[in-house]
């Protein structure tokens, strides 16, 4: 009986030690946050909260220059005030959020008179990606591009 228990213990120990991460810190990176620099923190906070639909989370500074939003488990969007003016951004550099229904999201944009377009830049148009995902793009108050899609793996 003792030999059987010892054999099981040694087998388990071997399997644990075979794992390369045993005894080492996990160094594989994961997304923690994305930060954007904005002109008017109140305007941008309202936009990301009310238009995009993100939830605010506590931020540690309490200095009136930061708003943090939850964007995924353990991942955040940090909105930081201090920019002197909005800047021009290429559409290829964008934030992307998935929603259950692009059509319902478009209703929110239309109600608030927020212009959106497809990838080609056609106003009030939707891109239908080759894999069936619907996409639209619009800008935040500081000119950052935002993509909204209905990527099904998110829901």
Predicted regions, residues:
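Bacterial Sec-dependent N-terminal signal peptides
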Residues: 1-26
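N-terminal beta-strand motif that seeds the catalytic metal site of vicinal oxygen chelate
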Residues: 21-42, 93-95, 154-155
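Core segments of cupin and vicinal oxygen chelate
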Residues: 36-76
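Vicinal oxygen chelate
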Residues: 40-42, 95-142, 153
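Exposed loop/turn and edge beta-strand positions of beta-sandwich/beta-sheet ligand-binding modules
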Residues: 63, 91, 132
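Mid-chain, structured segments of secreted extracytoplasmic proteins
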Residues: 66-111
């Amino acid at each position: 009986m003792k030999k059987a228990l010892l054999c099981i213990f040694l087998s388990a120990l071997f399997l644990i030690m075979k794992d390369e991460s045993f005894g080492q810190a996990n160094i594989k990176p994961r997304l923690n946050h994305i930060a954007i620099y904005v002109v008017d923190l109140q305007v941008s906070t309202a936009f990301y909260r009310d238009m995009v639909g993100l939830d605010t989370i506590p931020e540690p500074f309490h200095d009136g220059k930061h708003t943090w939003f939850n964007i995924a488990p353990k991942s955040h969007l940090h909105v930081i005030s201090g920019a002197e003016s909005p800047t021009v951004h290429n559409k290829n550099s964008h934030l992307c959020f998935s929603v259950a229904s692009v059509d319902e999201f478009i209703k929110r944009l239309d109600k608030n008179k927020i212009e959106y377009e497809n990838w080609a830049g056609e106003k009030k148009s939707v891109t239908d990606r080759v894999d069936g995902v619907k996409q639209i793009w619009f800008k935040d108050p500081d000119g950052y591009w935002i993509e909204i899609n209905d990527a099904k793996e998110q829901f």
